[in-house]
C-alpha cells in the first residue's frame, strides 16, 4: 500500500460521506459510504484483519477520493448513484435474473392465451403464476386449449387470416377468427379458463358437467360429448393455487446466498394486483452479511426506475433501517415503512419469495458450475493464462454486399450477457468484403465507448485470413487479447470446424466434446444475433420506404406516422382509432395503412 494513500486516510475528515478507491488509469475499484469517513477508512489500514479479496483490491489502489455529505441519507443515495454509474469492480454486483414464466390471457376482444416472461404490461394482459417450470406452463396451456378451445395465434394473424389454422382442425381452438364461435360464447370459455387459473376448478367443472347433462337430456349427444371431453382435459390441469393477493401496495423481499453469490427475490403488489416475482443476483458478497446485502439492494433497487410502495417486507432486521426509510421517503415523496411479517398471510408470502430465491440460486449455481467446467477446459485448449470471465464473439452479415452489419456477443461464467451485446452498422462501403468489415468492427469496438473493457478471449467467425486482420487491429491499438478464428467444415455445416490462432498450426476438436459444443453455441448465438439484427434493419428500411407507396401518403404524412408511433411495428399493432389520431390521417386512409402495413409485415415474416 502506498505511503501517500495511508497519509490521505489519516488526514480524511471525521464527517459523513462517500469514498472512492481509485486504481490505475483512474479506474474506480470500490465505492463506499461512512458515517465517519476517517474511522471507516482507517479500518483499511488493519491489513492483516481484512479478507483476501479486499487485500488484493487495496494493493491496486493509487488514491482515495472523498465526497462529504450533509447526512447519512445523502451518503446512502450518492453511494447508490455512483455504484450504478461507475460499476466498480469490487462492489456487490447486482444483476437481473431470469423472469419466471407466467401464463397470460390478453385483454383483446377475443383473448389469446400464451406463455410469457418479462416485465408486466397490466393494461394488455392478465397474468397467472409464476411457474417454476416452463414445461409446466406449456402443458397447462395445452390442457386449457383442449378444455376451452382458446386461440394461441398472434393478434396480427388473427385479424388477417381468412381460414382456420391447424389448431382448429386438431380441436384445440374454436376459430373465433372466422366466426366459428360467437363472441359471447368465446368470452364465456375465456372466463372459465381464467377461473381455472385462479384455482376455481371445482366451480368450472360443475358448470361444464351441468351443460353436458343438459345437452344429453336434449339428445344433443354430439355437443354433450364435446363438454365431456372438456371435463376430461380440465381434470388434467393441476394448478397449486395460493392466494397471491394483498390489499395494500407492498413489496416482499427474501435473500438466499451461497458463499460469494446471493439471490434476492421481490414479489410486488400494486393496486391489489400481483405484479409477479423477479430474482436478482448479487456477486462479490463474501465480505458482507445478508442484512448488509439486502440494505444495499433496497437502495439501489428503488433509486433507479422503481417507485417504492408504502410497505416493504423483509425477512429479518436490516442495517440502518431508519436511514433507509428516510432515503426511500426522498425517492417516493411519501412515507415508506420497512416491516417484518406479523400475520400468516404476510409470512406465507415471504416464504413463497424465499422458496423462489432458493430455486433460482440452485439453478444459477448449476448453470455456473457447468459453464465453469467448460471454460476451464477451453482455457487449457487455447492456452489462455486464466479461466476467461468475458468472451467476445464477432460475426458479420450482409446481402450481396449491401446493408452490412457486424455484431459482438458476450459470454461469461454465468452464460450469455445479452445486455453487453453490440451492433455495428458498417459505415464504409466494402461490397461484402468480410475482412474489411471485421477490421472496422474491431477497430470501433476497441476505440469506442467500451474500449476500457478488455475481454479475456476473442472468438472470430472466420478462417485463416482473419488472423492477420485481428492481429493488426490489436497491435495498432496496443491491446493484448488472445483470440482464435473458427471456420466451418468443408460443407459449411456444424462439425469438423477448424481453429486458427497466432503462432499455432490449425487444429480441430472432437465434434462431441463439451468445449466444441460450447464454442458452436457461441458461434450460433453470434450468427443468430447478426441475422436478426440484419433482418430488423432490412425490414425497417423496406417498410418505411414502402409507406411512401401507399396512395395518399407523402413525406409529410410518413414523418407524422413515424413521429407518432416510432416504428412500423408499432403502426401494425395500433388500432384504427389510434392511427386516426395522427394529424392528417382520415378514417379511410387509416384503414388502408393498417391493411398495407400488416400485409407487408406478414410477407416479411
Swiss-Prot record:
Family: Belongs to the UvrC family.
GO molecular function, one term: DNA binding
Domain UVR: 202-237
Matching Pfam families: GIY-YIG, HHH_5, UVR, UvrC_RNaseH, UvrC_RNaseH_dom
Designated name of the protein: UvrABC system protein C
Any one of the GO CC terms: cytoplasm
Annotated organism of origin: Wolbachia pipientis wMel
Classification via InterPro entries: GIY-YIG_endonuc, GIY-YIG_endonuc_sf, GIY-YIG_UvrC_Cho, Hlx-hairpin-Hlx_DNA-bd_motif, RuvA_2-like, UVR_dom, UVR_dom_sf, UvrABC_protein_C
Protein purpose: The UvrABC repair system catalyzes the recognition and processing of DNA lesions. UvrC both incises the 5' and 3' sides of the lesion. The N-terminal half is responsible for the 3' incision and the C-terminal half is responsible for the 5' incision.
Amino acid at each position: 500500500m502506498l505511503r501517500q494513500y495511508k497519509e490521505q486516510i489519516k488526514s480524511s475528515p471525521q464527517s459523513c460521506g462517500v469514498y472512492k478507491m481509485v486504481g490505475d488509469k483512474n479506474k474506480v475499484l470500490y465505492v463506499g459510504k461512512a458515517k465517519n469517513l476517517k474511522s471507516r477508512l482507517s479500518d483499511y489500514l488493519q491489513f492483516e484483519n481484512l479478507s483476501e479479496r479486499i487485500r488484493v483490491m487495496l494493493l491496486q489502489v493509487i488514491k482515495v477520493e472523498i465526497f462529504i455529505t450533509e447526512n447519512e441519507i445523502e451518503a446512502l443515495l450518492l453511494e447508490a448513484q455512483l455504484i450504478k454509474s461507475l460499476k466498480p469492480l469490487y462492489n456487490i454486483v447486482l444483476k437481473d435474473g431470469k423472469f419466471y414464466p407466467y401464463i397470460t390471457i390478453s385483454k383483446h376482444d377475443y383473448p389469446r392465451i400464451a406463455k410469457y416472461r418479462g416485465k408486466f404490461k397490466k393494461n394488455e394482459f392478465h397474468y397467472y403464476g409464476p411457474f417454476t417450470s416452463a414445461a409446466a406452463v406449456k402443458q397447462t396451456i395445452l390442457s386449457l386449449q383442449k378444455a376451452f378451445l382458446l386461440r394461441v395465434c398472434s393478434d396480427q394473424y388473427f385479424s388477417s387470416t381468412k381460414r382456420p389454422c391447424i389448431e382448429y382442425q386438431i380441436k384445440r381452438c374454436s376459430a373465433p377468427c372466422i366466426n366459428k364461435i360467437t363472441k359471447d360464447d368465446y368470452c364465456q370459455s375465456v372466463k372459465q379458463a381464467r377461473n381455472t387459473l385462479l384455482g376455481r376448478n371445482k366451480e368450472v367443472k360443475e358448470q361444464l358437467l351441468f351443460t353436458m347433462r343438459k345437452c344429453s337430456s336434449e339428445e344433443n349427444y354430439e355437443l354433450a360429448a364435446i363438454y365431456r371431453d372438456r371435463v376430461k382435459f380440465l381434470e388434467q390441469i393441476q394448478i397449486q393455487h395460493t392466494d397471491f393477493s394483498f390489499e395494500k401496495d407492498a413489496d416482499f423481499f427474501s435473500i438466499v446466498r451461497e458463499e460469494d453469490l446471493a439471490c434476492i427475490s421481490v414479489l410486488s403488489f400494486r393496486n391489489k394486483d400481483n405484479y409477479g416475482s423477479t430474482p436478482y443476483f448479487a456477486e462479490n458478497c463474501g465480505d458482507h452479511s445478508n442484512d448488509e446485502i439486502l440494505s444495499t439492494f433496497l437502495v439501489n433497487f428503488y433509486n433507479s426506475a422503481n417507485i417504492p410502495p408504502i410497505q416493504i417486507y423483509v425477512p429479518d432486521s436490516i442495517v440502518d433501517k431508519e436511514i433507509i426509510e428516510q432515503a426511500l421517503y426522498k425517492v417516493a415523496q411519501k412515507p415508506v415503512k420497512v416491516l417484518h411479517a406479523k400475520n400468516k398471510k404476510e409470512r406465507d408470502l415471504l416464504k413463497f419469495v424465499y422458496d423462489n430465491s432458493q430455486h433460482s440460486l440452485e439453478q444459477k449455481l448449476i448453470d455456473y458450475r457447468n459453464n465453469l467446467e467448460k471454460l476451464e477446459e477451453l482455457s487449457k485448449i487455447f492456452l489462455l493464462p486464466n479461466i476467461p470471465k468475458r468472451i467476445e464473439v464477432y460475426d458479420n452479415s450482409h446481402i450481396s454486399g449491401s446493408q452490412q452489419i457486424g455484431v459482438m456477443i458476450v459470454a461469461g461464467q454465468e452464460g450469455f450477457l445479452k445486455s453487453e451485446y453490440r451492433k455495428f452498422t458498417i459505415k464504409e462501403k466494402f461490397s461484402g468484403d468480410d475482412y474489411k468489415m471485421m477490421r472496422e468492427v474491431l477497430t470501433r469496438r476497441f476505440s469506442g465507448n467500451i474500449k476500457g473493457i478488455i475481454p479475456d478471449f476473442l472468438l472470430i467467425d472466420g478462417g485463416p485470413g482473419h488472423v492477420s486482420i485481428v492481429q493488426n487491429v490489436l497491435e495498432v491499438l496496443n491491446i493484448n487479447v488472445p483470440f482464435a478464428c473458427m471456420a466451418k467444415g468443408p460443407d459449411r455445416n456444424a462439425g469438423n470446424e477448424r481453429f486458427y490462432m497466432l503462432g499455432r498450426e490449425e487444429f480441430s476438436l472432437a465434434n462431441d466434446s463439451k468445449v466444441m459444443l460450447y464454442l458452436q453455441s457461441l458461434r450460433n448465438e453470434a450468427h443468430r444475433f447478426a441475422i436478426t439484427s440484419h433482418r430488423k434493419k432490412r425490414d425497417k428500411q423496406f417498410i418505411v420506404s414502402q409507406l411512401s407507396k401507399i396512395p395518399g401518403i407523402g413525406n409529410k404524412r410518413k414523418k407524422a406516422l413515424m413521429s407518432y408511433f416510432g416504428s412500423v411495428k408499432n403502426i401494425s399493432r395500433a388500432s384504427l382509432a389510434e392511427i386516426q389520431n395522427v394529424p392528417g390521417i382520415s378514417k379511410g386512409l387509416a384503414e388502408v395503412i393498417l391493411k398495407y402495413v400488416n400485409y407487408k409485415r406478414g410477407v416479411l415474416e
